[in-house]
């Protein structure tokens, strides 16, 4: 669900290029999605993590060899009310606030079973989210809550607001603040960073995460075709346009002349 925006864009262009191919995509939370993959209810998933060792071992015992296709680097983005006093935090400050309600901050997420939740639990080293976390039904509700509450911080995938050409993105970012974070214990080196595309390179922004297609069919089918499309030139340009960092970056040649214009020649 958290990466629905990029998946929908890839699906639309894929079916436009291959009109006889039809994808049946269901959006759900990451925890349930992996559970369904393990019992063969679904053949292909798009997720923010690889299969872990336990899941891989389970599938191997069933003679299944799933294939992973990395296609983008995204990030967990933090947003706050426009009137919030602070717009930048050290990594250590943010992890402390996530794990301890004493700060008085409320954290708002889209789904308690999402991949974002799993990553937060790893950060704070706890089995469950603390009481100062609220789970809402949609990203739209998260945005509305942040606009109405000065002490709240929303946690979303950056893909939801990464496309700078999107009217929706411009509207949201005009009403909330995108927070900046330092890297762990080295804020002097890089300062405070927002999850912009250029900060995803080399993982300068501390809350980056990879996006994967995982296919469990073991055969060449429409799912493999879709994964190949996403990792190919067109699919990677869609990733770039969405504000994320493509895993496979195509070469672009620029021609410079004695003029103020720059021409892309390839």
Where does each model-flagged region fall?
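Pocket-flanking alpha-helical
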Residues: 31-62
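Generic hydrophobic, aliphatic-rich segments that mediate packing or membrane embedding
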Residues: 33, 72-74
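Exported/periplasmic ABC-transporter solute-binding proteins
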Residues: 1-19, 23-26, 38, 67-72, ...
């Amino acid at each position: 669900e958290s990466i629905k925006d990029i998946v929908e864009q890839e699906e639309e262009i894929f079916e436009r290029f291959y009109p006889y191919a039809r994808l049946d995509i269901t959006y759900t939370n990451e925890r349930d999605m992996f559970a369904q993959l393990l019992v063969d209810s679904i053949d292909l998933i798009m997720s923010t993590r690889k299969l872990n060792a336990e899941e891989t071992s389970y599938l191997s015992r069933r003679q299944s060899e799933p294939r992973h296709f990395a296609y983008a680097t995204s990030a967990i983005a933090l947003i706050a009310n426009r009137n919030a006093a602070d717009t930048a935090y050290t990594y250590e400050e943010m992890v402390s606030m996530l794990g301890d309600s004493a700060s008085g901050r409320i954290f708002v997420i889209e789904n308690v079973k999402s991949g974002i939740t799993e990553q937060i639990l790893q950060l704070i080293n706890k089995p469950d989210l603390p009481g100062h976390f609220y789970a809402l039904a949609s990203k739209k509700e998260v945005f509305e809550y942040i606009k109405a509450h000065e002490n709240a911080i929303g946690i979303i995938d950056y893909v939801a607001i990464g496309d700078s050409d999107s009217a929706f993105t411009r509207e949201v970012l005009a009403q909330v603040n995108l927070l900046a974070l330092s890297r762990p214990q080295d804020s002097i080196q890089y300062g405070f960073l927002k999850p912009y595309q250029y900060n995803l390179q080399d993982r300068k922004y501390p809350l980056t995460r990879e996006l994967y297609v995982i296919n469990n069919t073991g055969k060449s089918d429409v799912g493999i075709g879709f994964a190949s499309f996403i990792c190919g030139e067109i699919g990677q340009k869609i990733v770039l346009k969405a504000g994320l960092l493509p895993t496979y970056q195509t070469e672009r040649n620029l021609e410079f002349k004695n003029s103020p214009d720059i021409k892309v020649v390839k």
